[in-house]
Amino acid sequence: FRDLSGDAINYAAEKDDIGRYNADDMLIENCSFYRLLGLPINIYRGGSDESTAGPYVTIRHCTFVDCCNKERGSVMRLIGPQVLTVENCNFDNSGRGGATIRLDEATWEKVRIANCNLWNSGRMVTTTAQAIQGKMYNIRPAYTNAEAYDYVPVRGSELEKLSIGLRKN
């Protein structure tokens, strides 16, 4: 996804807050997002109906470069996922006006954010702070060929060693 004025992945159409969400099991993996004005990832599940178990969201090995730097913006807006894993993601110059990840979770939800790199990027905002697990990094990324939109970390770089960011196919 690159050079977009709107949102890239938007599953936030629920309006009545009764737990009817747009996708049940979502995997976003090995994707790059470059120069997005809107939200790269926006997922919303409202309501408190415990009979609806979901959505299940996994976001891993993604790179966000110069995304959603508007005031009070966020790179990922995740409201209500009951099972969430965000891991091995690279945030480069993104979410500076607000947050890299804005997560609204309940204490009983199974949520985990781990092994991510935040270089010149906004903070993580969570409701309970239980989601952020393990080490977060602040490493200046070096990419294979950014001019050609190849955001795979340079071979032998710290990000490659930590398995953060895009993986070479």
Segments (PLM) and residue ranges:
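Extracellular beta-rich repeat passengers
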Residues: 1-169
